[in-house]
Amino acid sequence: MLKIEEIKEILPHRYPFLLIDRVTEMDIEEKLFVKGYKNVSANEQFFQGHYPQEPIMPGVLQIEALAQAGAVAILSMEKFKGKTPLFAGTNKVRFKAKVVPGDRLDLYCEIVKLKGPIGIGKGIASVDGKTVCEAEILFAIG
């Protein structure tokens, strides 16, 4: 549905911190959610130090990828276009499996609460249909 160039028109993030490659499904009218993915390459900068002998995608970056998925939905809404998404916190974070080079990290983020410019998203990241990370993401739009 949205390729990387279209995502870059919505999000202010850029390499090496743009962590969503494609949006495959999005609804900003009813349920307010995004499905997308990040192809996790062996060439990612973070693998140089985390960990060179057994590369694992840092959990905080998995959460950031989920937050960026949610931000695509929010910033696609007319009233928030061109604004900056801000992290406000996380709750109920769980990591269930490793994400390694060659994985496709599937992202799902649904905005479950939105009051003015502040809200909560529920994110689930998975690899091959298995949940690897889930989190409640608190955000503000600046």
UniProtKB/Swiss-Prot annotation:
Q: Where is the active site?
A: H50
Record's GO cellular component terms: cytoplasm; membrane
Q: Report the superkingdom from the record.
A: Bacteria
**Where does the UniProt annotation locate this protein?**
Cytoplasm
- UniProt record, GO biological process: fatty acid biosynthetic process; lipid A biosynthetic process
The catalysed reaction is: a (3R)-hydroxyacyl-[ACP] = a (2E)-enoyl-[ACP] + H2O
Q: Which GO terms describe its molecular function?
A: (3R)-hydroxyacyl-[acyl-carrier-protein] dehydratase activity
**What EC number(s) does this enzyme carry?**
4.2.1.59
Q: Does the record carry S-adenosyl-L-methionine as a key word?
A: no
The free-text function statement in the UniProt record for this protein reads: Involved in unsaturated fatty acids biosynthesis. Catalyzes the dehydration of short chain beta-hydroxyacyl-ACPs and long chain saturated and unsaturated beta-hydroxyacyl-ACPs.
Question: Cross-referenced HAMAP family, in alphabetical order?
Answer: FabZ (MF_00406)
Please give the name of this protein: 3-hydroxyacyl-[acyl-carrier-protein] dehydratase FabZ
What species is given as this protein's source? Answer: Clostridium botulinum (strain Eklund 17B / Type B)
Lineage of the organism = Bacteria, Bacillati, Bacillota, Clostridia, Eubacteriales
Q: In the UniProt record, what gene is named as encoding this protein?
A: fabZ
